[in-house]
Amino acid sequence: MHIILDNGHGLNTPGKRSPDGTLIEAIYTRQLVKDLALELEKHSHTVHILVPEPEDIPLNVRVKRINAICRAKGVENTVLISIHLNAAGDGTKWMNATGWSCYTCKGQTESDLLADCLYKAAIKHFPVGIAIGIVCSDAPVWEVFYCSFIEAVCK
């Protein structure tokens, strides 16, 4: 299995940080992607880090990179996971945000199966009520139209 990991926004993306600037999405998600890549490789998956650069890369460039990998490795063998941080409030003060979410393409797709696995794993590995938030077995999978989802050929 080829897994493309997209690490969200870049260092130069306005607003993608905590109110006091101590938590910067680009730094945090890039570390998450590196850690996840190591774990996936331990399980014999081939990992492609979509954006190794520190700066933000436009969506159309990301889509071209995604499609190149999908064409080379096979659409049926490739999964895209884009990691972002969610926020609460208007960015001017710290809030007490918790939890996480999973977004998939509109309609019933193979990405829904992965989302279901993520929710089940969260329930198994994270006790209800800890700082990461509360997850339940009927947690919603958010379906959206994102440029990278619409124009990418991978699943």
Model-derived features: where do they sit?
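Boundary/activation segment at the start of structured domains
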Residues: 1-9, 21
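Active-site-proximal helix/loop segments of hydrolytic enzymes
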Residues: 2, 27-155
